[in-house]
């Protein structure tokens, strides 16, 4: 998702620059491999007017100041390379003994308790559950709350509770060209949804505000209003823009 959203922001700012040429390299078989396949086709359609070339099922061997070398030997010259690859476990996990598997993440039980140290609980991207969950902010926040609660239960000699990931919709912003709401196999697309994505982001940030929700609320409300004014209001007169991608289940129009 990060690479696609970065491309959207590049096109937002520079798509009218005739000298712009973009190569997007994806190791997976298609764009956004963890989301419905129709997103791949729709993103490619949106990029047709611009000098964007997609290379899927392609691995990168090296990155230098001059460009990128692909695993199959091709060299892509670049004035600017944006690296938006996925996650890598920090060495601390293995050095501390929390991670002992080949993947390098901290091995935890369903309760987020370390498999190697009973008095350690691990939350967020660092935790490797028996049944993998998406390494996303919404899961990390829920895991943090459960880890704290389970630590208290552990100290009190009470039974620990397992982590149960709650299914949540995903919002993918593609600059000012499109925003997608993905809920399971259902996808809704509209530029109006860009403000909704900002709203979700601000809601997550409020949960982690150092001074608490009340003190952070005015600033968050101001940022949300700015995004609504810039991103949503210009589109409200054209609600017909809401559309469903072709291979997804029918959904009620917003």
Feature map (PLM): residue ranges:
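C-terminal auxiliary extensions adjacent to catalytic cores
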Residues: 176-254
